[in-house]
């Protein structure tokens, strides 16, 4: 996936579920806002490789810890508000274009590790009911999350 002409950053997002179909959400260290694990796709990088790389970097889970249940049919975009755009992703993008993946933990006791990088993005995580993230995320991502969850719920 390459940066498209519309100025959206190519990105992967992951909904990780456990055996009781609770979803993993994480709190951003710098803004204290909640979100699913997500991250950019490097230029020329395979989308699934990017997804597994981000999963490992952000929450310490490997490909062996999860099963790939499914993915969104296409991509979903959201705009970053102009008032904060200069502070997000260096102001280079007007938003993100995300490919969404649904992953299931193979073992509920798989360890979630948030300190896998020199500058971890998250400082806390929780397992919550499937729709609860819609009430806890920043407003500008809400519709993208609703669209992704509405599509992925049929795969559970």
Predicted feature residues:
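Acidic, metal-coordinating catalytic segment for phosphate/diphosphate chemistry
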Residues: 1-19, 90-91
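Active-site beta-strand termini and strand-to-loop segments that position acidic
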Residues: 16-19, 28, 103-105
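A conserved beta-turn-beta hairpin within the catalytic core of GNAT-like acetyltransferases
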Residues: 30-32, 95
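A short gly/proline-enriched turn/hairpin at secondary-structure junctions
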Residues: 35-39
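Unchanged
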Residues: 41-139
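Charged phosphate-binding loop/patch that engages nucleotide di/tri-phosphates or the phosphate backbone
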Residues: 130-156
């Amino acid at each position: 996936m390459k940066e498209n002409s519309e100025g959206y950053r190519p990105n992967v997002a992951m909904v990780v579920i456990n055996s009781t179909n609770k979803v993993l959400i994480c709190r951003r260290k710098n803004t204290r806002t909640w979100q699913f694990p997500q991250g950019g796709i490097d230029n020329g990088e395979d989308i699934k490789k990017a997804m597994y790389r981000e999963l490992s970097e952000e929450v310490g889970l490997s490909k062996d810890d999860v099963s790939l249940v499914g993915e969104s049919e296409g991509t979903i975009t959201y705009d970053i508000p102009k008032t904060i755009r200069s502070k997000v992703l260096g102001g280079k993008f007007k938003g993100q274009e995300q490919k969404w993946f649904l992953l299931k933990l193979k073992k509920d006791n798989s360890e979630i590790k948030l300190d896998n990088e020199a500058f971890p993005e998250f400082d806390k995580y929780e397992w919550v009911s499937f729709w609860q993230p819609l009430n806890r995320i920043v407003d500008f991502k809400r519709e993208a999350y609703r669209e992704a969850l509405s599509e992925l719920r049929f795969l559970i």
